[in-house]
Amino acid sequence: MANIASARKRARQAEKNRQHNMALRSRFRTSVKKVLKAVVAGDKEAAQAALKAAVPVIDGTVNKGLIHKNKAARHKSRLNARVKAM
């Protein structure tokens, strides 16, 4: 455990940021899974709606620095291709 006050504060901040990042990453994964689930089910309207909801979530994770912009672009492109192929 840290003894210096600034180190204790940094530990608190790191834990807070870790919790926040985990929540955002979970939202990202959940939104991607919703699109894939709708695609597998064959429900085109639900897949399009899920994709429309997932894109801002994916972009938000990029803005927060959780994933690289190329990874986000790859996810959006692949999800869009799967929805269009229905």
From Swiss-Prot:
Q: Which NCBIfam families match?
A: S20
The region annotated as signal peptide is: none
Q: Which organism is it from?
A: Thioalkalivibrio sulfidiphilus (strain HL-EbGR7)
Q: Which InterPro entries match?
A: Ribosomal_bS20, Ribosomal_bS20_sf
Source species, domain of life: Bacteria
**Residues annotated as region Disordered?**
1-22
- The coding gene here is rpsT
Give a short account of what the protein does: Binds directly to 16S ribosomal RNA.
Q: Name the GO terms of the biological process aspect.
A: translation
Assigned GO CC terms: cytosol; small ribosomal subunit
Q: Family assignment?
A: Belongs to the bacterial ribosomal protein bS20 family.
Protein name, per record: Small ribosomal subunit protein bS20
Keywords attached to this Swiss-Prot or TrEMBL record, sorted alphabetically, are: Ribonucleoprotein, Ribosomal protein, RNA-binding, rRNA-binding
- Ribosomal protein keyword on record: yes
Q: Which Gene3D superfamilies match?
A: Ribosomal protein S20 (1.20.58.110)
What Gene Ontology terms describe what this protein does at the molecular function level? Answer: small ribosomal subunit rRNA binding; structural constituent of ribosome
